[in-house]
Curated annotation (Swiss-Prot):
Region annotation (Disordered) ranges: 1-57
Source organism superkingdom: Viruses
Name this polypeptide is given: Uncharacterized protein L57L
Induction (free text): Expressed in the late phase of the viral replicative cycle.
Organism: African swine fever virus (strain Badajoz 1971 Vero-adapted) (Ba71V)
Biased composition (Polar residues): 23-57
Gene that this polypeptide is encoded by: L57L
Length: 57
């Protein structure tokens, strides 16, 4: 319970997460189908990616 909150706020956990986000974004642009890739990426990163995806785009 408490491990989930600090884990998302921890900057150390965000480092590897950001790298994966870039991977998702790159795959989305290469594949074109943003909706399909976005769904897969969001499922892998939960809502964290959905919140950063629109911000990066």
């Amino acid at each position: 319970m408490d491990d989930t909150l600090p884990k998302q706020m921890t900057p150390t956990d965000t480092s590897p997460l950001k790298e994966e986000q870039a991977h998702c974004n790159n795959k989305t642009l290469e594949n074109q189908p943003k909706n399909i890739n976005d769904n897969k990426c969001t499922d892998s990163q939960n809502t964290d990616l959905q919140n950063t995806e629109p911000s990066k785009v």
